[in-house]
Amino acid sequence: WLVPAYSAATAPVGALFALMTKVGVYTILRLWTLLFSSEAGASALFGSLWLIGGGMVTMAFGAVGMLGSQRLTHLAGFAAILSSGTLLAAAGFGQNLLTAGLLYYLPSSTLAVSALFLTADLIDRWRNDGASYAPFERSDNAPFLNAELVPTEGLNLDEDEEVLIGRVIPAAAALLGLAFIVCTLVITGLPPLSGFVGKFAMLSALLNPLGLTASAGTQPGAPGWTLFVLMIATGLLALIALSRAGIRHFWSTHVGVAPQLRVLEGLPIAALLALCITLTLLAGPV
């Protein structure tokens, strides 16, 4: 229900819903670590296997959902599910270093998903031109491919046969493209932004539960290795899904006017992504 509900709402409401989703995740983390910490005696780490298992299933569901989605708002909704599953699975281990990494990753992923909701609304409005069909429903998205999806020989990819060098890119289109790229980097955990820093901290904590300076014999168990592989695999699937969407919306044939972007529409996106960059610059050892 989450993805259809978030996608049906307006872009600002969808962005706020993404924020509220992570508030729920933080509530679970806060209460669970308070009531069932490793020092809670007989109830220590109660339900940890449920958190780890449920989080991993949520990660897989979110990644597969992103791979099967073509609308940007659906991609953003499944990205919220994917990041929430990552946080829940990491929280279930009850490790200090892993918790530190997820606490850094939590605001970063939240800001990026919220920015993606806002960016998706502007991109859809530009690409659809007010029509009732979505960009992926057009049959001429790739006129340079034949029926076998192979590039046609001798075809000039510029339909107007103009020189490709020196063509002007509208400022609004460039800003939308840049915002989409930054969201993609943070959500998928690619360097050099905060998504990579948070995921790297969690992966490092999984491989070295007691820290990099700990002695040998502290290798992760089966749940740790499973989460390690899932984090890398789901990041790859998310990258494929978002890259495919970016190619469809920014590189496909589009006949229409340049996007119109008002300052008040771009400021929230810029502020959210600026916070992600700030998190990157202020990252440090725990």
Protein language model annotation of sequence segments:
Residues W1-W50:
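Short helix-boundary/re-entrant hairpin motifs in multi-pass inner-membrane proteins
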Residues A5, W32, G85-L97, T184, ...:
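Interfacial segments of multi-pass membrane proteins
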Residues A9, M66-N141:
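Alpha-helical multi-pass transmembrane bundles of energy-transducing inner-membrane proteins
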Residues A9, R127, A131-F180, G235, ...:
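Cytoplasmic/organellar membrane-interface segments at the starts of transmembrane helices
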Residues A9-L19, E162-V168, G211-A233, V257-L261:
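Membrane-interface alpha-helices at helix entry/exit sites of multi-pass transporters
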Residues R30-S38, V182-S204, A274-V286:
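Alpha-helical transmembrane segments and their membrane-interface junctions
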Residues A42-T58, Y105-T110:
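Structural signature of hydrophobic alpha-helical transmembrane segments
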Residues T58-M59, A112-D121, G224-W251, V255:
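Hydrophobic alpha-helical segments of multi-pass membrane transport proteins
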